[in-house]
Amino acid sequence: MKLFPSTSTHASARSERSLKSKMAHICLSATFPLLLLGGGSVGAAEVLENSSSISSESAVANSNITLAAGDLYVSPNGSANNPGTINSPTSLANALTQIAPGKTIYLRGGTYSFSETITIERGNNGTSSQRKNLVAYGSEKPVFDFSAQSFASTNRGLQMFGDYWFVKGLEVKGAGDNGIFIGGSYNRLEQIEAHHNRDTGIQIGRYASTAAKSEWPSYNEVIRSYSHNNYDPDDGEDADGFAAKLTVGPGNVFDGCIAAYNVDDGWDLYSKSDTGAIGVVTIRNSIAFANGATADGTSTSNSDGNGFKLGGEKISVNHIVENSIAFNNKKHGFTYNSNPGSIQMKNNTSWNNGQSNFAFDKGTHIFTNNLSFQGGASDKTSGTDVSSTNVWWKNKKSVNDKGLLASAADFVSLVPSVTRSADGTPILGDFLRLANGSDLIGSGTPSGTNVGAR
């Protein structure tokens, strides 16, 4: 399926709201390929040549399912009075309170229409060795539709306040605020599609304003998921693709994800002076494009449009971004957003963003093997250029300190094409892939490593 029609640093700290549709629906299934921008579907080529392999420790296989004692089936028409068998499925609300650690709730396909938030309550936990599992049954596609909710900061879709849950294969749309909000720790989400929600598609943040900093959500993983066309109708300033901001602990990871057509930013890692520094977030093997407007062109003067926004309010946090790509975003591709710390930027590619591909005006950031081409403004790169391995867009040229020059000839294709494989892995085909004979191949560090993500 096609993913791409085509394409201000703000205090996105909408104080302690879960942070907040009217877009053309672009269906990007977590289980089917999706296509982008005018390119046809492409084969299962690897997205990011330099990528560390995307984590894939699925707790539950999606084929050859054998129902174990204690597992439960849920369907759109399930009843709390039913036992939760395949022939007599229970309701989701009932299953969430009944499932034991190590057991699985299988979601049958179809549309689950909700007018109220679904909450996995605090204390409803799995364990490190026995997660609680909430997964699509086989190849079926469960869709959680919260369109009946009104726009309000309390009207999230799925709230996860428990620990050690594994959630896979859901589509979540139309929520009055966040599509999915993670307030617990040690949770893992895979192959989620969040779209047309009225705030950020998938956000991590504290479960309540009374939570101590030691209770801030930590060590959550969002894997091979896609968040798009999220739009907050009050001012268009809050709805990002993914966010780990304001009140998150250490160890949260986004791996192999795509954020596109969100009215504000692709990723938002905002820190706020009221609550202090958040924990270090790692983003790898991920893509942000065409953020700052929805697919039908809906935007506001407040819509920032950064691909990866990595800070806020001059607070230092040493985030990590690796093997990721930003292109065609309204504003910057990657921005420090006033974070003066030592963000580690390694093997990223940024192309054709509205302003700077890399905007790191101040700080002691660490840059290794990054590639910038054809930005709207010159890059700003305060920090260390490790072994002079970065190629920056400066004065309308891509250059580096060792004399490398990048041109269109260094790429196999500059025609955007983005799809997802059956397991949600992003695929770019030849887009931004280094061409044979390019001087950028093998010019990074360690010796033999390519410059850029591909």
Give names to the regions the model predicted.
Residues 80, 129, 363-454:
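Acidic, glycine- and Ser/Thr-rich low-complexity intrinsically disordered tracts
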